Amino acid sequence: MEKLVIATRRSQLALWQSEYVKSRLLEHYPNMQIELQEFVTKGDKILDVPLAKIGGKGLFTKELEVAMLEGSAHLAVHSLKDVPTQFEDGLMLAAVTKRFDPRDAFLSNKYTSLEELPKGAIVGTTSLRRRMALKILRPDIELKDLRGNINTRIAKLNAGEYDAIILAATGIQKLGIENEVKYFSPISTDIMIPSMGQATLGIETTNDPKVLEILKVLNDNNAHIESTVERSFVDTLQGGCQVPIGVKATILDENSIRVQAIVGMPDGSEYISEDITADIEDYETIGQNLAQIFIDQGAKELLEKAEKVAFK
């Protein structure tokens, strides 16, 4: 193929990620012409309503998928955490890139950490998963919705609307804006378990064999194993991108993999959590088996309850 078109969202972070993928491809195919085709997704347009209340899956991927199915783009670059576990007919996950920093991060101009926040402090986040974790850790703080791109969210913090905000560490690090706030502190996954696929890029495409062959060079085996476990866990629970589920698989060595997972209510009042170590050779079934342990403890009923609360 002489020309490859990458569908991407228009945000600064999405463009960084697509340029990163473009540069990786050019390392292997220096003579290939690669273009970016920019889109504004439904999730980008609706900034005054928490994502959980919008509902549905693929809020940040649908428009890019349409472009691929219609033939105007060959692939799309997504934050893997935004990619639903089930694909439209004719589409598939072709590769997952090397994982960046998977942790969430604490940002503040007043306090160095979650522990230092005073009672009643206002913390900005819209993610139901982060809300759940924060309320489990600090039931005495106040949570306030936070939408917009990374720069908008930091601007709101700097304007004094929040005492602290929680964002994905990788986005801040990719854009090199850690110093735009006084305190930037990644949070251990032992305290706040990330979303499935967090800090990994998912490369989606059609089943065109020529394109699939080209995209093989982007796949990172460790990220593939970890994200397979995480996505299988969420898929078995039938949880979308906007419900309070955290899951993080971490390869420990050539034989074993650790999986941390949590499911619960957005207010932290009820939750189920597990932290297991399994044989890495079973990575294709670990997520499903762990999800079944959660289901046996009432996870599906808990998620249904959480969804009703979130969509009110």
UniProtKB/Swiss-Prot annotation:
GO biological process: protoporphyrinogen IX biosynthetic process
Cofactor: dipyrromethane
Residues where S-(dipyrrolylmethanemethyl)cysteine is found: 241
Keyword annotations from UniProtKB, A to Z: Porphyrin biosynthesis, Transferase
InterPro entries xref list: HemC, Porphobilin_deaminase_cofac_BS, Porphobilin_deaminase_N, Porphobilinogen_deaminase_C, Porphobilinogen_deaminase_C_sf
Top EC group: transferase
GO molecular function: hydroxymethylbilane synthase activity
Top-level taxon in the UniProt lineage: Bacteria
Known catalytic reactions: 4 porphobilinogen + H2O = hydroxymethylbilane + 4 NH4(+)
EC number(s) given by UniProt: 2.5.1.61
CDD domains xrefs: PBP2_EcHMBS_like (cd13646)
Gene3D superfamilies found in the cross-reference section: Periplasmic binding protein-like II (3.40.190.10), Porphobilinogen deaminase, C-terminal domain (3.30.160.40)
Any one GO cellular component localisation term in the record: cytoplasm
Pathway: Porphyrin-containing compound metabolism; protoporphyrin-IX biosynthesis; coproporphyrinogen-III from 5-aminolevulinate: step 2/4
UniProt cross-references to Pfam families, sorted A to Z: Porphobil_deam, Porphobil_deamC
Record's function text: Tetrapolymerization of the monopyrrole PBG into the hydroxymethylbilane pre-uroporphyrinogen in several discrete steps.
Quaternary assembly: Monomer.
PANTHER family from the UniProt entry: PORPHOBILINOGEN DEAMINASE
Protein name listed in UniProt: Porphobilinogen deaminase
Native organism: Aliarcobacter butzleri (strain RM4018)
Designated gene of the protein: hemC
